[in-house]
Every structure is written in structure tokens, then in C-alpha cells.
């Protein structure tokens, strides 16, 4: 799946994108609680580990608009109310320089569109027992020749 696919899939109902992100965290072992669509308190997902708040997550389904500092500040403000030590901001686009600087200063983990796709692939491919990394498997002609009967090989090589 690509960023374009995600935007196309969720643009009519961005709250479903929040559930998509929550499911990624569920796959890696968190309890992920999605907040109501309105009055969400400045975050979209509360991550719990052993019934304790682990992190707050804000999700933005943006096409080309970069996430700016004010949205990161809103998430940081929510952490005070919820007493969350870890903050994660996910977007399908990217972050402005000011947002990156502020996130670094306040220890907010940023996940842009490119990294979201990588994370999704890693999480969902780990479930697929038939999945393999194509780059890690290379076959050459010798790998096939051992399975072709000798008499057929003789005919093939005589005709070359």
C-alpha cells in the first residue's frame, strides 16, 4: 500500500485512518483506544501497556500539507492532562522544520508518510507466513537444473 492509496481509502472518513493506525499498534502488542471523533482532547489514540498509559498518538491524514508546530504543541498539551510520557504524531505527509525542531525539544516521536508505510509493511508482513523478502532470495540457473531430468537436459543442450 502506498501513501496515495491510504489517502484515497480514508479521505472520505479520516476517523477510519485513526483505526488503521491503532491497528498497527495493536499488532505490536499495545491496547489501542481510539478517542471519539469530536472533543478528543488533543489526541486520537491512547496506547496502553499493562493497563497503564504508554503513549498518546495524534493522526493526520494530509495529502501535501505539512504538519506544523501548532499541531505538535496541541499533542504536548494533551500529555499534561493525560499524564503521558510518550507522544507519537503520525501523518501521511511530512513535518515542517519548525514542527521537527519542536518535536525534538519535547521528545515527540514523528512518523511521516514514508515511515508509516515502512512500519505498516513490517507489521502486516510479519503476519503473513507466506511472505518473504524478494531481495534475500536469489536463484540462478543451477538451482533449476538439478530438477530437470538428465535426458531432457541433454536434448536442450544439444539444440543450443
Where are these regions (language model features)?
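Mixed-charge (Asp/Glu-Lys/Arg
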Residues: 1-41, 46-160
